[in-house]
């Protein structure tokens, strides 16, 4: 029996591609294991920061230490960007991003000698996942690859290619309908630069969202990360028209300072971002906006950072992902002057974390007493379910049916989410843990 484990780092696009590899391997007779020792390990890596690269390297060394005879295949953005560094790790094969699509051929070609197969990214996006995602509640559909933005700090466009490649609408329709038919309750539409979907073939993300509206079923749709400049009026109207489209967007603002945004190569000003926020919140005052912010970008002053704090306070993000600036090889930002000392980055990180925590609590307090639709995904303990609502807020509540939607009413806050009860219950206390 040929057993394989796939370890995935990074974004939802990587998660989709790992699922695609798993399906191809299973078709070829391999057994894909969720845990335990395997004969083959595929590490689908990320390269968005130095820290995640370190995690990738640690995992590979850990696998090799506990399983000397395993065959280890390293793929993903780190492998694509740094093949020379990757081949110095204890791996049997280094594969580029486009090579994932032919994982079976590559794994079958292992011959005892280390192989490095990394081509220039740029192949069309035609792959389809049939739907064997582990939890059977949430699935992903990758509709786009590549990024034609010119952000000065980002290496992902170098890994994924600078040309937008969109999945044809007909292929998307088939894949989406199949996911709904198989009973997935939440379908996440993802891409490296999702908002640019269709640019290469005379279509658009708004057109794709119109396709979704016509598909009946008990499901909901969530969009993954999108850039400020791509949230146009047609996208906003789609949220207004389609109740299945989750009122949540992850919009990476990166900084609250226009000066910093300009040095980052971002294509908007904070006033543009606020217009988008206002339009979304005019549809639904609770519209959930999550974001990414980089602290310590070269040249960031105390005044710039203060503007970021003020933005977080004003927008009331439901969640903020914070990163210390990490210079990526080959990017313009890695050569910029005005570097911020690591001690100052750490200080700003800690301050922003506290601010983000405060506004998240404030956002969640506002929804106490409101009814939400939660997709139960796992048990916290016997008789207590947990999952996310349409606004991407995590709930805990008494119940016993995983993989279904539950109407709940928010009662109080938890550490990272809320405690709720079934909407038809007066009380629904969650038992204390331990």
From Swiss-Prot:
One of its GO terms (cellular component) is cytoplasm. Keywords: 4Fe-4S, Cytoplasm, Iron, Iron-sulfur, Metal-binding, S-adenosyl-L-methionine, Transferase, tRNA processing. Binds 2 [4Fe-4S] clusters. One cluster is coordinated with 3 cysteines and an exchangeable S-adenosyl-L-methionine. The keyword S-adenosyl-L-methionine applies. Its cofactor is [4Fe-4S] cluster. PROSITE patterns: MTTASE_N (PS51449), MTTASE_RADICAL (PS01278), RADICAL_SAM (PS51918). [4Fe-4S] cluster 1 binds at residues 11, 46, 77. The keyword Cytoplasm applies. It catalyses: N(6)-L-threonylcarbamoyladenosine(37) in tRNA + (sulfur carrier)-SH + AH2 + 2 S-adenosyl-L-methionine = 2-methylsulfanyl-N(6)-L-threonylcarbamoyladenosine(37) in tRNA + (sulfur carrier)-H + 5'-deoxyadenosine + L-methionine + A + S-adenosyl-L-homocysteine + 2 H(+). It is found in: Cytoplasm. One of its GO terms (molecular function) is N6-threonylcarbomyladenosine methylthiotransferase activity. CDD domains: Radical_SAM. Signal peptide: none annotated. Its main location: cytoplasm. [4Fe-4S] cluster 2 binds at residues 147, 151, 154. Residues 2-112 form the MTTase N-terminal domain. Residues 133-362 form the Radical SAM core domain. Its EC number is 2.8.4.5. One of its GO terms (biological process) is tRNA methylthiolation. It holds the Pfam family UPF0004. Catalyzes the methylthiolation of N6-threonylcarbamoyladenosine (t(6)A), leading to the formation of 2-methylthio-N6-threonylcarbamoyladenosine (ms(2)t(6)A) at position 37 in tRNAs that read codons beginning with adenine. Belongs to the methylthiotransferase family. MtaB subfamily. This is Threonylcarbamoyladenosine tRNA methylthiotransferase MtaB. It comes from Thermotoga maritima (strain ATCC 43589 / DSM 3109 / JCM 10099 / NBRC 100826 / MSB8).
């Amino acid at each position: 029996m040929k057993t394989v484990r796939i370890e995935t780092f990074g974004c939802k696009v990587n998660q989709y591609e790992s699922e695609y590899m798993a399906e191809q391997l299973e078709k070829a007779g391999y057994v894909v294991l969720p845990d335990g020792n395997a004969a083959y390990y595929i590490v689908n890596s990320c390269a968005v920061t130095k820290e995640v690269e370190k995690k990738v390297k640690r995992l590979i060394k850990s696998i090799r230490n506990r399983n000397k005879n395993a065959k280890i295949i390293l793929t993903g953005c780190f492998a694509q960007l740094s093949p020379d560094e990757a081949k110095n790790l204890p791996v049997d094969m280094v594969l580029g991003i486009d090579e994932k699509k032919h994982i079976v051929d590559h794994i079958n070609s292992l011959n005892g000698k280390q192989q490095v197969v990394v081509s220039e990214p740029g192949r069309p996006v035609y792959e389809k996942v049939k739907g064997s995602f582990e939890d059977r509640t949430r699935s992903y559909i990758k509709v786009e690859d590549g990024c034609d933005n010119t952000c000065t700090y980002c290496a992902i466009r170098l890994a994924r290619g600078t040309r937008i490649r969109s999945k044809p609408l007909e292929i998307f329709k088939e894949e989406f309908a199949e996911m709904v038919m198989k009973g997935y309750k939440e379908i996440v539409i993802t891409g490296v630069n999702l908002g640019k979907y269709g640019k290469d073939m005379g279509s658009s993300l708004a057109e794709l969202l119109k396709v979704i509206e016509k598909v009946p079923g008990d499901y909901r749709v969530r969009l993954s990360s999108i850039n400020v400049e791509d949230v146009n009026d047609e996208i906003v109207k789609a949220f207004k028209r389609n109740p299945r489209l989750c009122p949540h967007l992850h919009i990476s603002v990166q900084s609250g300072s226009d000066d910093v945004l300009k040095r980052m190569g971002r294509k908007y000003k904070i006033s543009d971002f606020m217009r988008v926020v206002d339009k979304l919140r005019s549809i639904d005052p609770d519209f959930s906006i999550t974001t990414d912010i980089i602290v310590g970008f070269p040249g960031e002053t105390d005044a710039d950072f203060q503007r970021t704090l003020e933005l977080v306070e004003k927008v009331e993000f439901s969640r903020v992902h914070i990163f210390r600036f990490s210079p990526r090889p080959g990017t313009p930002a890695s050569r910029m002057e005005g570097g911020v000392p690591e001690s100052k980055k750490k200080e700003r990180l800690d301050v922003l974390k506290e601010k983000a925590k405060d506004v998240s609590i404030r956002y969640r307090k506002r929804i106490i007493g409101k009814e939400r639709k939660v997709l139960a995904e796992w048990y916290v303990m016997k008789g207590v379910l947990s999952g996310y609502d349409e606004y991407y807020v995590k709930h805990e509540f008494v119940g016993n049916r995983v993989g279904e939607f539950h109407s709940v009413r928010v009662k109080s806050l938890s550490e990272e989410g809320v405690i709720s009860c079934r909407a038809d219950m007066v009380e629904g206390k969650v038992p204390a843990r331990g």
